[in-house]
UniProtKB/Swiss-Prot annotation:
Originating organism: Sulfurovum sp. (strain NBC37-1)
GO BP annotation list: translation
Record flagged with keyword Ribosomal protein: yes
Annotated HAMAP family: Ribosomal_bL27
One term under GO cellular component: cytosolic large ribosomal subunit
Region of interest: Disordered: 1-25
Record gene name: rpmA
Protein name: Large ribosomal subunit protein bL27
Amino acid sequence: MAHKKGQGSTQNNRDSAGRRLGVKKFGGEKVIPGNIIIRQRGTKVHPGNGVGMGKDHTIFAMVEGVVKFENRSRSQKRVSVVPA
């Protein structure tokens, strides 16, 4: 005699919420120290001048200025903050 109810297929119908990653401040936008520029997993974009990188690879402004993106090579991108 079974002591559990039949489970059905609803066990699989779950999904996690999106992580809200991506670029938060685009090239040419003004930033102040502490503004988050990019949230990412891993170093998809590397930090340049005037920015810092958190332990979760978030890139943030350390100086006041304008965001500038540049391609260092075919595969590597870099973001900097240029004083305005």
